[in-house]
């Protein structure tokens, strides 16, 4: 069981805090095999959430060293999720006009973005590489590149919903994935062959005019050819947030159908995610060859000892996730993470 990104808003102006270290240390002690952190912004101009972590200069490295060491103490691996928010940037006074693949963005964006220029694409590619190098120096085990949910810059370039460009970065699926492939090549060249690169994608955007499962099978094969080590299959978009982060009353293991099909076409590990909130579900998914890895986020928020309890056969002692999305709804407004069934989640200590 791995833990996928779940925003906490526990950072301080982008810097790792003791609260963040305690939060992730508790999950590592609780038996999680690998933690993928919430988004980590790779450049200083735009912020996704005010309490997110950053790594756009070397001053952030000491905090990441402390976080990596805390997680490694319990045999757990850690990978930050590298990200640029594009049209998803938080509304902070003084922030310049939003940039994005095109002039279009989701209806909840604070303004119509301007298209990023080709020179800015090249600069941002280098900034992704810079951030990965800093993370490697800090001792993390790899990075996840976020390209799912029509979300942020790379997800926005990949989807036809928001990429309306007519240059070499728009039009065909090959052109729309060019930016993502250039970022992967930059990280691989600068961090070496032994540094793990994982890419998070939507296996299907479940939206008219969006990316389909067939599209994403093709993208996954291209990612494998580009040297990616793992594919993290989510689904949906932030336009219909419930399609990406399923709530109570929705299907458990909601994106497993996509991960199962993608797994048939690649030879690298495939992870699935999406309301996998009980141990038996993850066991069934692995046995059924729907994925190689199960990502369990909210389950590990509700009970930091989820994995240890499940492994010991004490599933009845696990504090259950009820799918209320309280963890999401508050932090999208800049508030610290909160959980209905685990009110101490922001203060968890190992």
Language model features with spans:
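Flavin-dependent oxidoreductase catalytic cores
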Residues: 1-350
């Amino acid at each position: 069981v791995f833990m996928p990104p779940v925003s906490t808003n526990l950072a301080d102006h982008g810097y790792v805090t003791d609260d963040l270290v305690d939060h992730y240390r508790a999950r590592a002690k609780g038996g999680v095999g690998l933690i993928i952190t919430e988004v980590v912004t790779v450049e200083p101009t735009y912020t996704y959430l005010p309490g997110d972590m950053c790594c756009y200069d070397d001053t952030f490295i000491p905090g990441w060293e402390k976080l990596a060491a805390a997680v490694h103490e319990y045999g757990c691996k850690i990978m930050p999720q590298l990200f640029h928010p594009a049209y998803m940037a938080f509304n902070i006074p003084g922030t310049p006009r939003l940039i994005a693949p095109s002039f279009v963005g989701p209806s909840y964006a604070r303004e119509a973005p301007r298209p990023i220029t080709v020179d800015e694409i090249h600069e941002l590619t280098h900034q992704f590489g810079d951030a990965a190098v800093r993370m490697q120096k800090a001792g993390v085990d790899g990075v996840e590149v976020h390209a799912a949910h029509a979300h942020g810059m790379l997800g926005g370039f990949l989807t036809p919903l928001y990429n309306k460009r007519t240059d070499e970065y728009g039009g065909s699926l090959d052109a729309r994935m060019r930016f993502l492939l250039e970022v992967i090549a930059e990280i691989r060249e600068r961090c070496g062959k032994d540094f793990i690169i994982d890419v998070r994608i939507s296996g299907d955007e479940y939206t008219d005019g969006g990316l389909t499962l067939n599209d994403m099978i093709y993208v996954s094969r291209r990612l494998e050819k580009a040297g990616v080590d793992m594919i993290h299959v989510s689904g949906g978009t932030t336009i219909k947030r419930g399609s990406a982060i399923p709530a109570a009353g929705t299907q458990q293991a909601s994106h497993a159908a996509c991960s199962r099909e993608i797994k048939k076409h690649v030879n690298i590990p495939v992870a699935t995610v999406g309301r996998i909130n009980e141990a038996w579900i993850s066991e069934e998914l692995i046995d059924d060859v729907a994925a190689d890895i199960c990502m369990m986020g909210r389950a590990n928020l509700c009970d930091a000892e989820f994995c240890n309890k499940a492994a010991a056969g004490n599933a009845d002692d696990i504090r259950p996730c009820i799918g209320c999305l309280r963890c999401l709804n508050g932090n999208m407004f800049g508030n610290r993470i909160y959980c209905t069934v685990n009110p101490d989640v922001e203060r968890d200590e190992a």
